[in-house]
Amino acid sequence: MNTNDAIKVLKENGLKYTDKRKDMLDIFVKEDKYLNAKHIQQQMDKDYPGISFDTVYRNLHLFKDLGIIESTELDGEMKFRIACTNHHHHHFICENCGETKVIDFCPIEKIKSQLPNVNIHTHKLEVYGICEECQRKAN
């Protein structure tokens, strides 16, 4: 998803387009990895001095509820990234930097075959580890 797509989702749901929301979405599009709310707040504070953590957090949860961003828990903390909408895939997530890599493999059919009497509504596969760049920096 890009910023314009996200703004379209906001408008389709009767929500206001604001420069703050656009700038927050731009951060996700530009960085393209999982980010915590504090990082977003610090980035936003450069252009909007004094922006509250509550304002950032409310918008993050609004974006998540609308499917604009995705979330995961990493090291006991919620992290967010722009939603991937181009095709079904899963992610490798670096535990150090939050960088993500696409995994174009989905085990859901195998899982369904092992659970024939259940109705699976949705699924999410995340693989965690240390990316090549962080490994290189550690050595």
Swiss-Prot record:
Localization terms from the record: Cytoplasm
Keyword match Endoplasmic reticulum: no
A GO CC term attached to the entry: cytoplasm
Major location category of this protein: cytoplasm
Pfam families hit by this protein: FUR
Keyword GTP-binding: no
Biological process according to GO: negative regulation of DNA-templated transcription; regulation of secondary metabolite biosynthetic process
Keywords: Cytoplasm, DNA-binding, Iron, Metal-binding, Repressor, Transcription, Transcription regulation, Zinc
UniProt region (Dimerization), positions on chain: 86-139
Gene Ontology molecular-function annotations: DNA-binding transcription factor activity; transcription cis-regulatory region binding; zinc ion binding
Sequence positions that bind Fe cation: 88, 90, 109, 123
Quaternary structure and partners: Homodimer.
UniProt similarity note: Belongs to the Fur family.
Biological role: Acts as a global negative controlling element, employing Fe(2+) as a cofactor to bind the operator of the repressed genes.
Designated name of the protein: Ferric uptake regulation protein
Organism: Staphylococcus epidermidis (strain ATCC 35984 / DSM 28319 / BCRC 17069 / CCUG 31568 / BM 3577 / RP62A)
Gene name of this polypeptide: fur
